[in-house]
Amino acid sequence: MSTILLNLDFGEPSKKAFGGNAKHQRFVKKRRFLEQKGFLSKKNQPPSKVSKLNSEPPKKGETSRVDSISKILSCLKKKKEAAASKRDSEQSKDKKASLSWLTPAPSKKTDSVVAKIDLLGEFQSALPKPKRRTQKKGSKKPLKKKIATENSTQTQSKDKGSNKKPLKKNAVQNSTQAQPEDKCPKVPQSLPRKMVAIDCEMVGTGPKGRVSSLARCSIVNYNGDVLYDEYIRPPCYIVDYRTRWSGIRKCHMVNATPFKTARSQILKILSGKVVVGHAIHNDYKALQYFHPKSLTRDTSQIPLLNRKADCPENVTLSLKHLTKKLLSRDIQTGLSGHSSVEDAQATLELYKLVEVEWEQHLAQNPPEN
């Protein structure tokens, strides 16, 4: 077994003098010097030293410095006061000079009163005169005076035979002036309404292609000019293009307009207009839209056209047959299919044949929407 030896010293340790930092000692000396000179504030000084400094009388050099500083401050205050007084005096002089032309220097009592009155008169004459109120145009009294003066001057200058013309002029003036100026001329209630003709071509969708979907729409104005003619891609898959009748082929659907956008464009054109069509209910069904009956003209339901074509009124004639009979024109010919633009133009020309008579009939028997 190894033994452990411990050397313990129970005596008091030797006290070493704490020298401190030389830089700190220099700072303390400078601080004491500044405190003695009075450059440090009372907050930075301990209370014991502050009381000593206050109790000690100032030295000769310090008193001279304080006196010089106080003299400089007093001089600066005096200069500021003098400058302020000069400014006030200059402003008062300017005010007096600006108002001197209103108050003349009186030599005697009578002269001063007369001068004041003259100046007041000049001042009032220089002021702008108030404008007189003019009477309203619709008032009756000034009109009578003007008419009387005009008649008197005209009678003096002209003979008796020439007095009739100014009387007529005055009558016209009275009639025009009696009418209120704010009212505009009345607009006729029955304005000519805009009219368009429409024709649509369909393709077969749904089971076995039995559902008719819109594939082309053409709209022409009253003069036959084309307003709208677009191929339209239906939302459903096309089973039968019906090219023999519609003229629609697969290539026409490549860049065709979608149904929703085409429908919104078409309805904007039709809104508020008289729409002419042949068997137009089929076109409205393909558009998923129904126009007001009062603004719809269906040439397949007008008996006047059947009468002109020497056909029974109760029979629904095709557009091709009516065009051949009444317009002496052949449409829908060839194997390329129908043209919706051609059909719309033919429909409009057929309606123009009976437009006046049919519109009178509708005015007497308006259709119920």
From Swiss-Prot:
Q: GO molecular function, one example?
A: nucleic acid binding
The EC number on file is 3.1.-.-
Q: Name one Pfam family in it.
A: RNase_T
Q: Where is the composition biased (Basic residues)?
A: 129-146
Task: Describe the location of the Exonuclease domain by residue ranges.
Answer: 194-369
Tell me the keywords, alphabetical order. Exonuclease, Hydrolase, Nuclease, Nucleus, Ribosome biogenesis
Q: What is its main location?
A: nucleus
How is this protein named in the record?
A: Interferon-stimulated 20 kDa exonuclease-like 2
